[in-house]
Swiss-Prot record:
Region (Disordered): 60-103
Record-level Gene Ontology MF annotations: enzyme activator activity
Protein name (database record): tRNA (guanine-N(7)-)-methyltransferase non-catalytic subunit TRM82
Subunit: Forms a heterodimer with the catalytic subunit TRM8.
A Gene Ontology BP annotation from the UniProt entry: tRNA (guanine-N7)-methylation
Organism from which the protein derives: Scheffersomyces stipitis (strain ATCC 58785 / CBS 6054 / NBRC 10063 / NRRL Y-11545)
Length: 445
């Protein structure tokens, strides 16, 4: 069977789908499902560990050199000593090569997979992050190319693992798990040594999402973290904090600014609700309640880990994706919400007075891993968690009464699924599909 797609992303025109599975990135033409771009990350999963080994060797070599110089100086100062003693310091001591550290029992596994993907504003570049060597990757995208439409132009390694990216047309903004945010150019310039990179802003907690936003022709960086904070920083003077948005009680995993109104922000994470903000004005407009709607779709997976499980424990909600669009038919505005590892999509109508009402709960046969939206025709492409070799995607289109319906694209879906080159024998060979809930802080934190 095929390994499910982990990330799906579509261009604004809705003509091409970007999808990742493990360390493989593919671009599909949606008119026929044909592969027009492909890239495989061949970096060794143990590259960071090998770097540690190399650094230790350099330290040992420097220590050995300093010891030899010290001994030689002592011998020169002791001219009365026998010649054989003078030559003692000339014998080079062998360096004991440190072993490559191997994660012990219980250590988190090292995966070689693409952690995040995003298109630049002009869609001329595709950016992502890798888990193997803690790097940001930047591709030039040429959809008119008759060959591979993807060309890797930069791979910038970071000291800490990057977990989220955003960009404008010139700059890639990268957030890492240490709480720092970096800015690197979207260009062909060679990457710099990771130790020379300086963060442009930082949180005291692990970052979970980042956005580049514009308001009144001024740029800002919005960051969400594990400690339920949302920070609004000026950019490029990102040390200047515009606002802190306080409304969440659990981690913030998803920040979304609608294209139809850049003054709004929808945020979600580990709470039972979403927050709707006027982010520039630091105004919380409303909280969108989710628990009653999602409760029928929460399963054993959504319970806390066994060591934290009590009689009072509730099944937990973790927001995987937030999207917004305007219906071409009714011109009404909608919010689409995906909760992690659930067989449903929630749709809410956003009214002119910024009140929000539930519109639809779309039930699916399989858990949804990720979704993306084609704005041109208000349709959704979903990557589904299915043990099959036939259909790893589903298409939903907006029908009458602005209700999503399953659309028949059997041939295209099968063509795309067949092009997925990641075959596995059993489910346990799947890479992480659901990890957002691990951001939730427990009593041990």
């Amino acid at each position: 069977m095929k390994h499910p797609f982990q990330i799906v992303l579509v261009n604004k025109a809705g003509t091409h789908l970007f999808a990742s599975v493990k360390n493989h990135l593919q671009v599909f033409r949606l008119s026929d499902g044909k592969v027009v771009g492909s890239w495989i990350d061949t970096v060794d999963m143990f590259t960071p560990l090998k770097k540690q080994q190399e650094e230790k060797i350099k330290v040992l070599q420097e220590q050995n050199k300093q010891t030899e110089e010290s001994e030689n100086n002592e011998i020169k100062n002791e001219s009365a000593e026998p010649a054989e003693k003078k030559s003692k310091g000339n014998d080079s001591k062998p360096i004991k090569i440190p072993k490559i550290p191997v994660p012990g029992p219980g250590a988190p596994p090292i995966y070689n997979y693409i952690r995040s993907l995003a298109l630049s504003e002009d869609e001329k570049h595709l950016m992502g992050t890798t888990d193997s060597d803690k790097a940001a990757i930047i591709f030039k995208v040429d959809l008119s190319s008759e060959g591979n439409c993807l060309t890797l132009i930069k791979r910038q390694v970071f000291q800490k693992r990057p977990c989220a990216v955003s960009s404008d047309q010139e700059t890639l903004i990268v957030a890492d798990k240490f709480g720092d945010v970096y800015s690197i150019g979207i260009d062909n310039e060679a990457p710099v040594d990771e130790k020379e990179l300086s963060p442009i802003l930082g949180h005291v907690s692990m970052l979970s999402d980042v956005l580049v936003a514009t308001y009144n022709d001024k740029k800002f960086i919005l960051t969400g973290d594990r400690d339920e904070h949302i920070r609004v920083s000026n950019y490029p003077k990102s040390y200047v904090i515009k606002n802190w948005l306080f409304g969440h009680h659990e981690f913030v995993s998803n920040l979304h600014i609608p294209e139809f109104d850049s003054s709004l922000l929808v945020s979600g994470g580990g709470d039972d609700y979403l927050c709707l903000w006027k982010w520039y004005d630091n105004q919380l407009l409303s909280k969108i309640e989710l628990r009653d709607l999602l409760l029928p779709f929460l399963e054993e997976f959504h319970l806390p880990p066994e060591r934290f499980l009590t009689d009072e424990s509730q099944k937990e909600i973790s927001i995987a994706k937030i999207l917004t669009f305007v219906s071409k038919k009714s011109q009404k505005k909608y919010i689409v919400v995906l909760a992690e590892n659930t067989k449903c999509l929630l749709t809410f109508e956003l009214k002119a007075d910024n009140t929000v009402t539930h519109k639809q709960t779309l039930t699916t046969d399989f858990p949804i891993i990720d979704i993306c939206l084609i704005s041109e025709n208000s349709s959704i492409i979903a990557a589904v968690d299915r043990e099959t070799s036939d259909s790893l995607l589903e298409f939903y289109t907006l029908g009458d009464e602005d209700v999503f319906e399953v659309q028949s694209h059997t041939d295209i879906i099968q063509t795309i699924t067949s092009a997925n080159e990641c075959d596995v024998e059993k489910r346990r060979e799947f890479y992480p599909l659901y990890y957002i809930n691990t951001l939730r802080k427990r009593s041990e934190h």
